């Protein structure tokens, strides 16, 4: 499939372009947890469309899902944002947060490249972040600025559903869409540079 290149998007009006798997997918949505997540998501989209920020939507989603324990897996470079997010969420839920450098595992253990050669440097530990939040038994985990790859490992090991509040982009102030909204970056990327 190459939906991004389709100009009609008739699926928006109910056309089924993938009949061979549709019934199987419908059966997956009928599973209790999936159905509730999909229903709450549809409710939030329809009720708060263009009215609430992503953060407000996360709060509303968690309330409607009846989540009590929220986990935050954050990058040490966004500790202030994580602190603010935790403070806001704590008004509604039990909040637990785990920094990316948890356990202090030295990059030398795996011979990983360091930012500053010759200095001690702890590696990011997304598997550790996930395992700690798994032990706590969080209902939902929120990613705040984990590096590319680390976010993937975190989601792979998290037992709780995961959403992202901030996607790390050091160049564009964590506004990843800026790369395709800014003509300079878009041109550079389209040219393959």
From Swiss-Prot:
Pfam families per the UniProt record, alphabetical: DUF1847
Top-rank taxon, per record: Archaea
Protein name: Uncharacterized protein MJ0455
């Amino acid at each position: 499939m190459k939906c991004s290149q389709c100009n009609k998007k008739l699926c928006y009006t109910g056309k089924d372009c993938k009949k061979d798997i549709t019934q199987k997918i419908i059966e997956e949505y009928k599973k209790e947890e999936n159905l509730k997540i999909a229903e709450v998501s549809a409710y939030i989209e329809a009720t708060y469309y263009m009215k609430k920020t992503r953060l407000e939507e996360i709060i509303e989603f968690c309330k409607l899902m009846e989540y009590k324990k929220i986990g935050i897996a954050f990058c040490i470079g966004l500790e202030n944002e994580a602190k603010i997010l935790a403070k806001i969420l704590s008004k509604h839920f039990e909040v637990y947060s785990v920094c990316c450098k948890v356990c202090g595992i030295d990059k030398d253990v795996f011979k990983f490249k360091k930012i500053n050669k010759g200095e001690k440097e702890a590696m990011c530990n997304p598997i550790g972040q996930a395992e700690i939040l798994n032990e706590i038994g969080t209902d939902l985990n929120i990613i705040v600025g984990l590096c590319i790859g680390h976010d993937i490992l975190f989601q792979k090991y998290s037992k709780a559903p995961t959403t992202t509040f901030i996607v790390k982009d050091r160049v564009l102030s964590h506004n990843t869409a800026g790369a395709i909204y800014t003509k300079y970056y878009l041109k550079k990327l389209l040219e393959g540079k």
